[in-house]
Amino acid sequence: MVLKAIVIDIDGTITNPDRSLDLDVAKRFRELNVPVILSTGNPLCYVHAAAKLIGISGIVIAENGGVISTGFDSPSIIADGKEECEKAYELLSQYHDLVKLDDAYRKTEVVLNRDVAVEDLRSTLSENGIDIEIIDTGYAIHIKSTAMNKGTGLLKVAELMGLEPTDYLAIGDSCNDAEMMQVAGFGIAVANADSDAIKAARHITKASFGKGALEAIEYALSNGLL
C-alpha cells in the first residue's frame, strides 16, 4: 500500500499541549512529496491561516466536513445544516446556559464553550425528538448535522483531487477524527487521542500531540505507506 496524500487534524494533533503549533511537524510537512490536507472542526478562516503559515496546500476540510476549500483563493463548498443547528441551539438555550464561539465565522454548525455537560445536551435533544449530533472534541462542543463529518469531507476532497479516500493517510486525536480514519487508507492516532479515535486507528503513536504526528509520519515512511 502506497498512500498519495495525508489528511490531518490540527488541535491536539499537530499542536503542543498549549495549542501552539509544533514547528518540527510543520517543517516535516514541507519536506514531504505528498499533499498535506488540514482537517479540523475550526472555521475556514482559521484553517486557511494555519495552512498558509505552515506552507502547505490551501485544500482544507473545515467545520468537521461542513466546509471544503480547494485553495486559498477558490470558492468554498458549504454543506447545508446551519439552520437545523440554530434551531437545536435555540431549544437547548431554554434549558441550559450556553455560550457560542466564533459564530460569525461558522457556516454549517454551532459551536459552544465547554462549560456544560454534553450528555445533558444530548438528553435534552432526545427528549424533544431532535435528530442532531453533539460532539465534544476536547476543545469545544459542536452542534452539527448528522449528515456531515470529517469522513464525508474526505470523500469530497478525494473526489476533487482525483483520488480515492483510501489513498490518504489520516492522523488525528479526537472523536471527530474517527470517521476520517475509517474511510482513509490508513489511520493513525496520536498517543493523547480519545477512545473513539483510538478504536478507529490502525496504529497508535508512543508520542503525544505534535511529536506524535511527527512519529506517525516517520512510521508511515519507514513502513512504505508513503
From Swiss-Prot:
GO terms for molecular function: magnesium ion binding; phosphoglycolate phosphatase activity. Signal peptide: none annotated. Its EC number is 3.1.3.18. Substrate binds at residue 150. Pfam families: Hydrolase_3 (PF08282). GO terms for cellular component: cytosol. Gene3D superfamilies: 3.90.1070.10, HAD superfamily/HAD-like (3.40.50.1000). The keyword Methyltransferase does not apply. Mg(2+) binds at residues 9, 11, 173, 177. The active site is at 9 (nucleophile). Keywords: Carbohydrate metabolism, Hydrolase, Magnesium, Metal-binding. Its cofactor is Mg(2+). It comes from the Archaea. It catalyses: 2-phosphoglycolate + H2O = glycolate + phosphate. InterPro entries: HAD-like_sf (IPR036412), HAD_sf (IPR023214), PGPase (IPR006382). It is an enzyme of class 3 (hydrolase). Catalyzes the dephosphorylation of 2-phosphoglycolate. Belongs to the archaeal SPP-like hydrolase family. This is Phosphoglycolate phosphatase. It comes from Methanococcoides burtonii (strain DSM 6242 / NBRC 107633 / OCM 468 / ACE-M).
